[in-house]
């Protein structure tokens, strides 16, 4: 019933993907060999969304693991939950994409893409009523960004009416692997704007700041960053995995969250923020969770929501708590900060509550915001892109794989358009429309005279 097929591409995608499966397997009572060892019917009620029940009563993730080199997938396979995945669903090349978007999208990735699509088809045939796909990848490398976006457009071609949802890790100068990240990211965003329905922007810079400032980790590792990502992914998929009424599938979430088709880049947040291994022992209250969740420091994208306005917001509270208190707190925060919510979409904040908290916490809350402040993130990438592109630095790596400079120019202008669209709706007020009609009437009256 209402299945989601999960695809993870590239090193980053496979690492956060593997972590995601560890976390949700734990929440659903699935052990590393796929047996159910849980104690609650709620864990099994919607298990088929992410897992396929095999003949031996084992639960197998509907996951497809893709990379252009074998390294990361070997470590996933030998990791704690490596035997959970279907062995045929590991698809990898040997050559690697060398952090080059063109290799992932046009050359190396294009050679591997058909064998990936075969596995995608097989997974979809196993579904009763597929609701859509989710992809975990990064935008800074070669495989996740180049081949990831290639997969999106191919899957989109074949399943045009299914929802396409991505968890996209956006590069940042603070945690940088390669100098060409701005190129790869811009080329990817160019694709995501057109071909996805929902994109959660997870930003290394924000994750790094959270580890550094809030969790007081002196030297955050990728493991620490991934811990935050998996908590957030577990949170935003809660309403898809456990019984509930609100945003219970990807399409309903999209309908609530996306007022204009291009503006589907969400800013996720999570509360309470905890370190790996030291989950908090103090019980949090609903007001504290609500405060924290709307705090700029808790956002997983390095943008300050106070610099923009929320078009729409969805929140998920987890744990045993009073619905009434949750509703009161959410109303309070909206009326106190009403200037940060656009007034031309009434009731633009939706709240879901799920009884099952994540492991180690009594309560938690997850935040999904569609804020115009996300333009800060695109501006940041755009500035870095322009600085290099003006001098045509590193371009030969891309043109050598058959790309044209035009494609860079198009991607750049598409991203700049996206920024201006966010700005336009940030400045829009509810009155403007009415004033425009009055002017028209006056003109037509004068015309009638």
From Swiss-Prot:
<keyword id="KW-0342">GTP-binding</keyword>
<dbReference type="GO" id="GO:0000278">
    <property type="term" value="P:mitotic cell cycle"/>
</dbReference>
<feature type="modified residue" description="Phosphoserine">
    <location>
        <position position="444"/>
    </location>
</feature>
<comment type="function">
    <text>Tubulin is the major constituent of microtubules, a cylinder consisting of laterally associated linear protofilaments composed of alpha- and beta-tubulin heterodimers. Microtubules grow by the addition of GTP-tubulin dimers to the microtubule end, where a stabilizing cap forms. Below the cap, tubulin dimers are in GDP-bound state, owing to GTPase activity of alpha-tubulin.</text>
</comment>
<feature type="binding site">
    <location>
        <position position="11"/>
    </location>
    <ligand>
        <name>GTP</name>
    </ligand>
</feature>
<feature type="binding site">
    <location>
        <position position="204"/>
    </location>
    <ligand>
        <name>GTP</name>
    </ligand>
</feature>
<dbReference type="InterPro" id="IPR017975">
    <property type="entry name" value="Tubulin_CS"/>
</dbReference>
<feature type="region of interest" description="Disordered">
    <location>
        <begin position="421"/>
        <end position="449"/>
    </location>
</feature>
<feature type="binding site">
    <location>
        <position position="138"/>
    </location>
    <ligand>
        <name>GTP</name>
    </ligand>
</feature>
<dbReference type="GO" id="GO:0046872">
    <property type="term" value="F:metal ion binding"/>
</dbReference>
<keyword id="KW-0479">Metal-binding</keyword>
<dbReference type="InterPro" id="IPR008280">
    <property type="entry name" value="Tub_FtsZ_C"/>
</dbReference>
<protein>
    <recommendedName>
        <fullName>Tubulin beta-4 chain</fullName>
    </recommendedName>
</protein>
<feature type="binding site">
    <location>
        <position position="226"/>
    </location>
    <ligand>
        <name>GTP</name>
    </ligand>
</feature>
<feature type="modified residue" description="5-glutamyl polyglutamate">
    <location>
        <position position="438"/>
    </location>
</feature>
<dbReference type="InterPro" id="IPR023123">
    <property type="entry name" value="Tubulin_C"/>
</dbReference>
<dbReference type="GO" id="GO:0005525">
    <property type="term" value="F:GTP binding"/>
</dbReference>
<keyword id="KW-0493">Microtubule</keyword>
<feature type="compositionally biased region" description="Acidic residues">
    <location>
        <begin position="429"/>
        <end position="449"/>
    </location>
</feature>
<keyword id="KW-1017">Isopeptide bond</keyword>
<comment type="similarity">
    <text>Belongs to the tubulin family.</text>
</comment>
<dbReference type="InterPro" id="IPR036525">
    <property type="entry name" value="Tubulin/FtsZ_GTPase_sf"/>
</dbReference>
<feature type="binding site">
    <location>
        <position position="69"/>
    </location>
    <ligand>
        <name>GTP</name>
    </ligand>
</feature>
<keyword id="KW-0460">Magnesium</keyword>
<dbReference type="InterPro" id="IPR037103">
    <property type="entry name" value="Tubulin/FtsZ-like_C"/>
</dbReference>
<dbReference type="InterPro" id="IPR000217">
    <property type="entry name" value="Tubulin"/>
</dbReference>
<feature type="binding site">
    <location>
        <position position="142"/>
    </location>
    <ligand>
        <name>GTP</name>
    </ligand>
</feature>
<comment type="subunit">
    <text>Dimer of alpha and beta chains. A typical microtubule is a hollow water-filled tube with an outer diameter of 25 nm and an inner diameter of 15 nM. Alpha-beta heterodimers associate head-to-tail to form protofilaments running lengthwise along the microtubule wall with the beta-tubulin subunit facing the microtubule plus end conferring a structural polarity. Microtubules usually have 13 protofilaments but different protofilament numbers can be found in some organisms and specialized cells.</text>
</comment>
<feature type="binding site">
    <location>
        <position position="143"/>
    </location>
    <ligand>
        <name>GTP</name>
    </ligand>
</feature>
<dbReference type="Pfam" id="PF03953">
    <property type="entry name" value="Tubulin_C"/>
</dbReference>
<feature type="binding site">
    <location>
        <position position="144"/>
    </location>
    <ligand>
        <name>GTP</name>
    </ligand>
</feature>
<dbReference type="InterPro" id="IPR018316">
    <property type="entry name" value="Tubulin/FtsZ_2-layer-sand-dom"/>
</dbReference>
<dbReference type="InterPro" id="IPR013838">
    <property type="entry name" value="Beta-tubulin_BS"/>
</dbReference>
<dbReference type="InterPro" id="IPR002453">
    <property type="entry name" value="Beta_tubulin"/>
</dbReference>
<dbReference type="GO" id="GO:0005874">
    <property type="term" value="C:microtubule"/>
</dbReference>
<keyword id="KW-0206">Cytoskeleton</keyword>
<dbReference type="GO" id="GO:0000226">
    <property type="term" value="P:microtubule cytoskeleton organization"/>
</dbReference>
<feature type="short sequence motif" description="MREI motif">
    <location>
        <begin position="1"/>
        <end position="4"/>
    </location>
</feature>
<dbReference type="GO" id="GO:0005200">
    <property type="term" value="F:structural constituent of cytoskeleton"/>
</dbReference>
<dbReference type="Pfam" id="PF00091">
    <property type="entry name" value="Tubulin"/>
</dbReference>
<keyword id="KW-0597">Phosphoprotein</keyword>
<keyword id="KW-0547">Nucleotide-binding</keyword>
